Structure formats: C-alpha cells, structure tokens
UniProtKB/Swiss-Prot annotation:
Gene encoding the protein: ubiD
Recorded metabolic or biological pathway in which this protein acts: Cofactor biosynthesis; ubiquinone biosynthesis
Membrane topology term: Peripheral membrane protein
Catalytic activity: a 4-hydroxy-3-(all-trans-polyprenyl)benzoate + H(+) = a 2-(all-trans-polyprenyl)phenol + CO2
An annotated GO cellular component: cytosol
Residues holding Mn(2+): N177, E243
Classification via Pfam families: UbiD (PF01977), UbiD_C (PF20696), UbiD_N (PF20695)
Localisation per UniProt entry: Cell membrane
Source superkingdom: Bacteria
Binding residue positions for prenylated FMN: I180, Y181, R182, R194, W195, L196, R199, G200
Protein name: 3-octaprenyl-4-hydroxybenzoate carboxy-lyase
Cofactors demanded by this protein: prenylated FMN; Mn(2+)
Amino acid sequence: MKYRDLRDFLAQLERQGELKRITAPVSTRLEMTEIADRVLRAGGPALLFENARHNDAPADMPVLANLFGTPRRVAWGMGADDVGALRETGELLASLREPEAPKGLRDALAKVSMLKAALWDMSPKTVRSAACQEIVWEGADVELSRLPIQTCWPGDVAPLLAWGLVITRGPNARRQNLGIYRQQPLGPNKLIMRWLSHRGGALDFRDHAQAHPGKPFPITVALGADPATILGAVTPVPDTLSEYQFAGLLRGSRTEVVKALGSDLSVPASAEIVLEGHLLPADDPRAVAAVVPEGANPPPATGYEMALEGPYGDHTGYYNEQDWFPVFTVDRITMRRNPIYHSTYTGKPPDEPAVLGVALNEVFVPLLRRQLPEIVDFYLPPEGCSYRLAVVSIRKQYAGHAKRVMFGLWSVLRQFMYTKFIVVVDEDIDPRDWTEVVWAMTTRMDPVRDTVLVENAPIDYLDFASPVSGLGGKMGLDATNKWPGETSREWGTPIHMDEAVKRRVDAMWDTLGL
C-alpha cells in the first residue's frame, strides 16, 4: 500500500494489529525507552503513548515509538508487501545509479520511462498551504522543552531528538539533501547538530561555509513525515536524485512539499512538526560562545557556533565520547493541529536502527551486484551494529577472488566505508546462517594465509576500540574453498547424502514412528 502521510500509515498499522495505543501515563525519561525496547525485542507493534508525561507534567502531544520496529513494517513503509520485495527497490536504485545499456528498442523505451518517472514525474510538488504550518511558534514561543523529547538512558547528558529529518541544500546544489542526524537540546531554541563529515548535510554545510563564509546556513528539521520520505532519507539514493523524488517513486505519487516560512528550503507538507532555523556564524549576536571543559580539546575553527555534544547511549550499546558539532538555532516551530511527536531510542542491538538495517540489507544486494556481479548474497548482522561486520557469499572464479571482493565492498558504497570485518564465503554457504558461516571459517580458513589486515583506514568515530578517533584497522576473512595457487594441498570434498537414498527415506518417513 501507499500512504499519504504518517497518520494514514498509522491507521493501516492499527487495522493490521501493528499499532498499540498506550493510555497509561508513561514518562519520556527512561520509562518510554524501557517499554519500547522490550516490545521491539519481542517483535511487537508500534507504540503510541497517548498519555506521555514530560518534565513531570502531561505532554502536549502523544509520542510515537517503534514505528519501524519490525522488518515487515519497514517494507510496508516503503510500499512493499514484504521484506523480500525490497530487492525490487534495490534493483531500481541500481538502475538509477548506473543504467545498463539497453538490449533493444523495447528495453530502451522502458529505461527512458523509468528515468522519466524518477527525474521528472516524481519531482516534488510544491503546494501553497500545508498541514505542517497550521500552528506556528515564533519568538518567545519557541521552546523546545514543550516537545516531549525522550531521555533514553541514565547516563545521557540531556534529552535526544532522534528522528528528525534534516533538510539542507549546498550553494551549488539544485537538489535538497535529507538526512537523519541526532540532535541535543541546549536550551529553549538551540540544538547540537551531530552529523559525520561524510554525510550529506555536513557536506552541504562545508560547501556553504567555503562559498559564503560568515553567512548563516539555513536548515529545517521535519518530524513525523510520511513513511516513504522518512525511509528515503536512510536509503542510499544516487547523488543525482533527491530523496523527495525517491519517496515519490516508493509512494507512487509526487511528494508534496511547502516552502519553509523563513528560508527557501522545502519541507514535507504533511509533516507533524517542523523546526526552522540556521547554523549561525560565531560572531552573530545570537550565537553563544563555546564552553571548553577543563582538559577537553577546543572546538575546530569553523567560524560557526559550536558546542560539545554527548555523551549519549548509542547504537553500539555504549555511551559515546564527546565531540564538537555545529549548533542549530531554531527560529520557529510549525506543526499540524494535534501533532504526533515521532521518537526512537538507540542502544545495544537490536534497536530500531538495527531493524532498519536488516530490511535495507535487501536493498543493498542489487546495488552491490551491479559493481560485483559475482555476489550471491550479502548480510549485515544486526548484532554487528548493522554495518561493522558483513558476510558475503560469492561465485568464486579464481585464486585471490575473495580479496578483490573485500576491497570492492570497502569502496563501492559510502555506507560500507566503516565496515570493520568482512567474511567472504562460497555460494554453498548461507551468509545469514551463523552455523554455516562458522563451519566455513573453521574448515576453509588458515588464520595466517586467509586473513587480510588493513591499517589506518576510515573508521566510525564512535568506535572507541580504534587506536585513533576516525582511523583504525579492518579485517577481511577469506572463508572460501581454496584454489590452486592459494594452497598446494588436496582440498576436502564436502559430504552429501545420495539423493536417491534421501527420496527413499522421505517415502518411508511416516512409517518410522519418528
């Protein structure tokens, strides 16, 4: 099914028994996380806390959690019937990234039709008025504490805005970038924008600071957009395609957007809540000077307002280190009447990002096959923090093939530049079955010959196990059968029962009393 907005999606989930309304009072401080975590681990429904308590008082709006807490709900949000159907989404993205030469006139017309749908028919539709601007808070009315922002873990430095869809545009870009970056409230109208340097929003900001130094950088943050737009922001969309366009392809209709009240950025017209504002130059009267704790490194000299972010409990299952990030000053907050605050938590897998990773794994396979057609299957186990460990099965064709695949995976998509461990197995091994993977590792690997170690490679700065922040090692494990040139020994032959015997036993099975 396709969904016009978040409320349309929630209505469908409720009809399917996939949404639970909770009327008992529940605090946004810790209690909501504990409930959501228990329900997610049990494969339970999305949760709508209708009697949320925030800062020891009733919240002004309900809180939605665990929206994408199962792979099936992720698939539904992307317009698919089940997780397996997301392979088709991956095929579409692969074609948009690198179209193959047409095989004939009919195929050429089909490819032209697809590109037309992606690049023109699904360009966002701008509307003059929108539900997301029915209510406007400006000036002294801007107070972030009025939003029921969760405090997720006991050691968190502050509440954490975790599902904000951050919308930016670089100075030379025609398309807007949508990304999801966590944000730490600093006061009534300020949030720390934690984005990593390779992410789209950070790149847009870098380009703006270089092209227009000393000028405020406009940003909007949408909360509670329709599911296709939310999921488009976490999918590896080609740089030539807007996430709004991709959301339109998923939905089957153009994404409706409206111009922000204070900038030229376009926001999802049906979003529940929108924050508008800027990253301010450090010398702007509204900017606050950075406070450097004793013993801490000073902020980088960006020329913009910066603050020390964290610590927060993260998707790794640990509290992360503090680091400096730019500060987002909120000029106004717009929202629908009776808005819903969309929230989540991150913690030791499984959490909601880990579930998203399981579902999006199906999208990655066709993208990877376009670059490495020998790939049979690819798996990012959620317990590996969704991206730090990958298992890939291949149709091995020559000695050294597994090593080529390792380095290819580290290079093909930005999403895998932080993958620390890659295990390569043959096509007879199911990479999603640990019993088979471990069997292959223990019978087809020599620890010295078949281990590839790479030093001084890019690593997620949240990875405190690396010797230097942002830089560390990688390991590739070749658990494939070895070819001549890789070994001089006679290689083992796997044991298989005769098929005729298996059929005879199948026929007599019911008579055996087993």
